[in-house]
Design a protein with these regions (language model features):
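Conserved catalytic core of the tyrosine transesterase superfamily
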Residues: 1-193
Length: 193
């Protein structure tokens, strides 16, 4: 089981759990757009999904009762991802606002205020602008939520195989980049203590 890591790969940027909370908690569920943005950020972090997976999730892919979502990843590979209690609460608050006064038959979970599909650039804008408004002084993009989810899972003691399944990586060597991030985190924590 000799797995080598390509060392020229840049380590992914990661947000702290506090920064993740700042992003999610920036919004409330008072209005549709605010609720949608809050739920998008929480959903991306909680499921570790890619932008392409997020914009293609349909309402029928969510099972609130059983607390899971069906995601379609790269190469049309499907995976089932559990939904934690926090993201479930956000989904339960978002869905009635999403479906109120529905003027279209769009089945996508996350839609624009004109009931159209969200595209990748819209998601990039949401993440970037939320970071600025929430006072997070880092370059933000949707994939940072996926990187953060994987890193936090490993830091919390999750094994590499589970993280691999969670992210939908076909090879564990792809997932191993996060062990380097975690190692860097541990070294930094050790130096600071």
């Amino acid at each position: 089981n000799n797995i080598s890591i390509k060392s020229e790969k840049k380590l992914p940027n990661v947000l702290s759990p506090d920064e993740i909370d700042k992003l999610i908690d920036f919004y409330n569920h008072d209005l549709f757009i605010s609720s949608r943005n809050k739920t998008i950020i929480d959903f991306m972090y909680s499921t570790g999904c890619r932008v392409s997976e997020l914009i293609n999730v349909e309402e029928s892919d969510i099972d609130i009762e059983e607390a899971f979502v069906r995601l379609e990843g790269k190469g049309s590979k499907q995976r089932i991802v559990p939904l934690g209690s926090k993201v479930l609460i956000n989904l339960e608050s978002y869905l009635p606002l999403r479906n109120k006064d529905r003027k279209s038959k769009n089945n996508k979970l996350f839609i624009s205020k004109s009931y159209k599909n969200l595209d990748r650039t819209a998601v990039f804008r949401i993440i970037k602008s939320t970071g600025v408004k929430a006072g997070i002084h880092k370059e933000l993009y949707p994939h940072i939520l996926r990187h953060s989810a994987a890193t936090h899972m490993l830091e919390g003691g999750c094994d590499l195989r589970t993280v691999q399944e969670f992210l939908g990586h076909s090879s564990v060597s792809t997932t191993q980049i996060y062990t380097k991030v975690t190692k860097a985190f541990l070294e930094e924590a050790f130096i600071e203590s």
